[in-house]
């Protein structure tokens, strides 16, 4: 184990000097013995000097401190011992529940599976959320992005997905909290505990208050745990909240590492860093990883380089819209902007496909008529258009749904709606079978039967 000494500290970036014939490799983990801090090598500058990123606070470091090379990358425990536990980026427990029992530790830097190991799947993963199952169905082993600005419900929608999938499919999940609020991480832990699904979830947190090195690597730590379950012939769910903060952490250290910034100040290696993470989230012949990633959209601008780079890796995109949230419709999913590769007659069947497209057609027509209604009022519309507007408003309200995880705020018990019921209900609304019901009856209900019951009380 070779030793070196710190020669420069600039925020999270630390230069360490070793003997020239003992220079650490890129991605090796180094230990600052006195401070109990782990550094990860990013660059070899020459003359035995390496540039590293600190995986914790660099407060109190000084030049000349001794640093030991572990001769290995950062490794985290994998397997059943991680279930129900909260870990940090280094795989150390932070839930005060004793040490983690494990038989194997893996490096957080792994090569993606080889081409001949990959497996394709067209199986649909039922989520119980109407708008998702109808408009942007998930593929087992696919990647899903939840796009939205600040405060439109990304984290709540993600918590509902974890809750539903853990209860209905009893699969293992890994949750990587990347640069999100510590309060949300805390709420999430107790939410899982109360729902009795904590023993099926591994939690890896590197929250907002952590230094950038921590946030840059915590997604990889979570992914390594998910890969461990996948290699045990399991179907795993990987949740990342929030993938934008992973990019942002890279941006924070990029300039300090001496790289020229690219568009909007992002790191020039943005696409490569994103690819290194996303290419590992995939299904092999042994098991599958289905991933759901929350993507913060800066200033609601989907063309920003960070969300734009993420888009290219996804199979389905769920776009949360502020305009829909303002109407009080939650989940605030935009049915015209959200897409899925699985929405194909060969995958979901002709009936589902036609219903989804009919719903989108009605909503698109309503969107076009909105300007006319705003200027001239409803009376100037043809009878056919009046019908479309009426149905569109019902569809819009019926796309809302009470969530289990939001029960404490709303007082409405959460609803899980099967895919069969969802398709049949929307087909009936589009065909005009419920034209006689008031639109308020469709708001915040589960199945169409509940809407009929609610209409009797209005």
Swiss-Prot record:
Pfam families: ATP-synt_ab (PF00006), ATP-synt_ab_N (PF02874), ATP-synt_VA_C (PF22919). It is an enzyme of class 7 (translocase). SMART domains: AAA (SM00382). It comes from Francisella tularensis subsp. tularensis (strain SCHU S4 / Schu 4). Its main location: membrane. It comes from the Bacteria. F-type ATPases have 2 components, CF(1) - the catalytic core - and CF(0) - the membrane proton channel. CF(1) has five subunits: alpha(3), beta(3), gamma(1), delta(1), epsilon(1). CF(0) has three main subunits: a(1), b(2) and c(9-12). The alpha and beta chains form an alternating ring which encloses part of the gamma chain. CF(1) is attached to CF(0) by a central stalk formed by the gamma and epsilon chains, while a peripheral stalk is formed by the delta and b chains. Keywords: ATP synthesis, ATP-binding, Cell inner membrane, Cell membrane, CF(1), Hydrogen ion transport, Ion transport, Membrane, Nucleotide-binding, Translocase, Transport. It is found in: Cell inner membrane. GO terms for cellular component: plasma membrane; proton-transporting ATP synthase complex. Its EC number is 7.1.2.2. Belongs to the ATPase alpha/beta chains family. Gene3D superfamilies: 2.40.10.170, Bovine Mitochondrial F1-atpase, Atp Synthase Beta Chain, Chain D, domain 3, P-loop containing nucleotide triphosphate hydrolases. This is ATP synthase subunit beta.
């Amino acid at each position: 184990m070779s030793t070196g000494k710190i020669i420069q500290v600039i925020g999270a970036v630390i230069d360490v000097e070793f003997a020239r014939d003992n220079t650490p490799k890129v991605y090796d983990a180094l230990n600052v013995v006195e401070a109990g801090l782990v550094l990860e090598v990013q660059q070899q500058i020459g003359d035995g000097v390496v540039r590293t990123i600190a995986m914790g606070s660099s407060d109190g470091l000084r030049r000349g401190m001794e640093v030991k090379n572990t001769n290995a990358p950062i490794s985290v425990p994998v397997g059943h011992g991680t279930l129900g536990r909260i870990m940090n980026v280094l795989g150390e427990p932070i839930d005060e529940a004793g040490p983690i029992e494990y038989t194997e530790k893996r490096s957080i830097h792994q090569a993606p599976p080889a081409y001949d190991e990959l497996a394709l799947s067209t199986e649909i993963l039922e989520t119980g959320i109407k708008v998702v199952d109808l408009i942007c169905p998930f593929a087992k082993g696919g990647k899903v992005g939840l796009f939205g600005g600040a405060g439109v419900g990304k984290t709540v929608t993600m918590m509902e997905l974890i809750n539903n999938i853990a209860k209905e499919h009893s699969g293992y999940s890994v949750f990587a909290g990347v640069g999100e609020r510590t309060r949300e991480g805390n709420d999430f832990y107790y939410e899982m505990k109360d729902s009795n699904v904590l023993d099926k979830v591994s939690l890896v947190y590197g929250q907002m208050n952590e230094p950038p090195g921590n946030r840059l690597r915590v997604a990889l730590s979570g992914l390594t745990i998910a890969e461990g379950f996948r290699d045990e012939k399991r179907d795993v769910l990987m949740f990342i909240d929030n993938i934008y903060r992973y990019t942002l952490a890279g941006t924070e250290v990029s300039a300090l590492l001496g790289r020229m910034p690219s568009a909007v100040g992002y790191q020039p290696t943005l696409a490569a860093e994103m690819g290194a993470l996303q290419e590992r989230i995939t299904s092999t012949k042994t098991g599958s990883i289905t991933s759901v990633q929350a993507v913060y959209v800066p200033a609601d601008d989907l063309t920003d380089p960070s969300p734009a780079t993420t888009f290219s890796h996804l199979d389905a995109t769920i776009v949360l819209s502020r305009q829909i949230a303002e109407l009080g419709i939650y989940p605030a999913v935009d049915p015209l902007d959200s897409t899925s590769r699985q929405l194909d007659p060969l995958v979901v069947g002709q009936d589902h496909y036609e219903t989804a497209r009919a719903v989108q057609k009605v909503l698109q027509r309503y969107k076009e008529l909105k300007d006319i209604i705003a200027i001239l009022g409803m009376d100037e519309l043809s009878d056919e258009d009046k019908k479309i507007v009426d149905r569109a408003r019902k569809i819009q309200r019926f796309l809302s749904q009470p969530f289990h995880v939001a029960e404490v705020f709303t007082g409405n018990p959460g609803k899980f709606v099967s895919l069969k019921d969802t398709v049949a209900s929307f087909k009936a609304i589009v065909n005009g079978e419920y034209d006689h019901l008031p639109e308020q009856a469709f708001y915040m209900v589960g199945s169409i039967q509940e809407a009929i019951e609610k209409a009797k009380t209005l």
